[in-house]
UniProtKB/Swiss-Prot annotation:
Record InterPro entries: Chaperonin_Cpn60_CS, Cpn60/GroEL, Cpn60/GroEL/TCP-1, GroEL-like_apical_dom_sf, GROEL-like_equatorial_sf, TCP-1-like_intermed_sf
Main location: cytoplasm
Biological processes, Gene Ontology terms: protein refolding
GO cellular component: cytoplasm
Signal peptide: none
Subcellular location: Cytoplasm
Sequence similarity: Belongs to the chaperonin (HSP60) family.
Entry binding sites for ATP: 30-33, 51, 87-91, 415, 479-481, 495
Name this protein carries in UniProt: Chaperonin GroEL 2
GO MF entry, a single one: ATP binding
EC number per UniProt: 5.6.1.7
Xref: SUPFAM superfamilies: GroEL apical domain-like (SSF52029), GroEL equatorial domain-like (SSF48592), GroEL-intermediate domain like (SSF54849)
């Protein structure tokens, strides 16, 4: 086992704070509308240019082990905030640095770090309650667009695209971000339910231009086993042919004689039918077939529940307004399922989401909810170069997380104003002793840090602006983009409550741990001197000629 260095007290904390400052100073240059970019080296390809706090934090590893321990703890603040709220990573880092900076003065003055921590916790709890009271629900598309714009570094086009996407697929819908193929960012919305299975034979195509099969007002047969014998299907096909409507068959597999007969009948124009494989595998396949049944108002024909193909009636089949089947995807538009049944199914899947233990399961369940509830939107990010594409895509993803957070917990005034107002409205927060009071006081001073940093990055005088904002009331604050004062919400400068709350809680949590640190243990720096070898080699042996042979 390698030897370890053990460092105590003030020296340990000082080295840790140096690491905190290095990381926080690199991250905080990105804060605010006039924040700067950070360029990150890549082992191959072009460097990445970013204005995303957590991306910068993740890249930083320091050579000095003690400094690195401090930096990694602050990195945890940014990562945790990003995981929970999806944004606010730079704010969280700035707050953590400010709380550590203020707190270390009190620790050096001999105050009890544990009482300071208790004071910090009391202050944070009071401030979070005030933020919740000040929070306003997001109701309009305009507010969602404003939240997205602020998070995407004041890019209004990104905010508008996200608001449009939420309008089209609902606030619970799935919105994904992909690389675009043009210079402009675009929104592509898939209405209805889409699953990744296409036609089983190209002979089903009836729309050669799109290379797809279009079915208007079709019946939908859902079967959870293989279909290889056409005799099992005949009763259903005869009933559908009499009704004069098309049919979509979704089964585990349609093969052999059954598939050949369906193709021949389609080519002869006797029947308009398309067969596709059921989506998913195993239990997930059964669940997705059940989803499609609820959406189309049909039943899954399963032998386990005593149903067989030969006895299927038209009442057992689902229906939809239109179905489009491509080579790789099937889209069911406007299924005939009852709204109440669909809602009940969505609730059922949501319960499963809450109980899911793995991220993969949770993601797949959320996709099912979106498909049932209204569709999927794809934002295709356009840019001139790959470097710009990466940077822009990261901003769109941040903005998307921020808008989701705003929908969840509402919004507060942006630009660091919400924290200052929470400090004013929280009134007098009392600790149990002088050291706890000091902990409360240091948090109330530290929460000015985000506004100070925004002003500093915009080239202004931080103290003047902070005093001017504190002299105002409500949403009155400073717009650093154009150096004006006014109502932040009216000016469209909003922050999701969840982002501000999470940033404060995570920053205080990690900063408290640092203040209560008394000892650090790390591997000893390796001695760089070369290991003692065999001296200058086997000197003195001379050449073979010296041996007189």
């Amino acid at each position: 086992m390698a030897a370890k260095d053990v460092i105590f007290g003030g020296e340990a904390r000082a080295r840790m704070v140096e690491g905190v400052n290095i990381l926080a100073n690199a991250v905080k240059v990105t804060l605010g509308p006039k924040g700067r970019n950070v360029v990150l080296e890549r082992s191959f390809g072009a460097p990445t240019v970013t204005k995303d706090g957590v991306s910068v934090a993740k890249e930083i590893e320091l050579k000095d082990k003690l400094q690195n321990m401090g930096a990694q703890m602050v990195k945890e603040v940014a990562s945790k905030t990003s995981d929970i709220a999806g944004d606010g990573t730079t704010t969280a880092t700035v707050l953590a640095q400010a709380i550590v900076h203020e707190g270390m003065k009190y620790v050096a003055a001999g105050m009890n770090p544990m009482d300071l921590k208790r004071g910090i916790d009391k202050a944070v709890h009071a401030l979070v309650e005030e933020l919740k009271k000040a929070s306003k629900a997001t109701t309009t598309s305009k507010e969602i667009a404003q939240v997205g714009s602020i998070s995407a570094n004041s890019d209004e086009t990104i905010g508008k695209i996200i608001a449009d996407a939420m309008d089209k697929v609902g606030k619970e819908g799935v919105i994904t971000v992909e690389d675009g193929k043009s210079l402009e960012s675009e929104l592509d919305v898939v209405e209805g339910m889409q699953f990744d299975r296409g036609y089983l034979s190209p002979y089903f195509i009836n729309n050669p231009e799109k290379q797809s099969a279009l079915l208007d007002n079709p019946f939908v047969l859902l079967y959870d086993k293989k279909i290889s014998n056409i005799r099992d299907l005949l009763p259903t096909l005869e009933q559908v042919a009499k009704a004069g409507r098309p049919l979509l068959i979704i089964a585990e597999e349609v093969e052999g004689e059954a598939l050949a007969t369906l193709v021949v009948n389609t080519l002869r124009g006797i029947l308009k039918v398309v067969a596709v494989k059921a989506p998913g595998f195993g239990d997930r396949r059964k669940a997705m077939l059940e989803d499609i049944a609820v959406l189309t108002g049909g039943k899954v024909i399963a032998e386990e529940v005593g149903m067989s193909l030969e006895k299927v009636t038209l009442a057992d089949l689902g229906q939809a307004k239109r179905i489009e089947v491509g080579k790789e995807n099937t889209i069911i538009i406007d299924g005939s399922g009852e709204a109440a049944d669909i809602e009940a199914r969505v609730k059922q899947v949501r319960v499963q989401i809450e109980e899911a233990t793995s991220d993969y399961d949770r993601e797949k369940l959320q996709e099912r909810v979106a498909k049932l509830a209204g569709g999927v939107a794809v934002i295709k990010v356009g840019a001139a170069t790959e470097v710009e594409m990466k940077e822009k895509k990261a901003r769109v993803e941040d903005a998307l997380h921020a808008t989701r957070a705003a929908v969840e917990e509402g919004i507060v005034a942006g630009g660091g104003v919400a924290l200052l107002r929470a400090k004013q409205t929280a009134g007098v927060i009392k600790g149990d002793n002088a050291d706890q009071d000091a902990g409360i006081k240091l948090v109330l001073r530290a929460i000015e840090a985000p506004l100070r940093e925004i002003v500093y990055n915009a080239g202004g005088e931080a103290s003047v602006v902070v005093n001017a904002v504190l002299a105002g009331t409500g949403n009155y604050g400073f717009n650093a983009a154009n150096d004006t004062y006014g109502d932040m919400i009216e000016m469209g400068i909003l922050d999701p409550t969840k982002v501000t709350r999470t940033a404060l809680q995570n920053a205080a949590s990690v900063a408290s741990l640092m203040l209560t640190t008394e000892c650090m243990v790390c591997e000893s720096a390796k001695d760089d001197a070369p290991a003692g070898g065999m001296g200058g080699g086997m000197g003195g042996m001379g050449g073979m000629g010296d041996m007189g042979m």
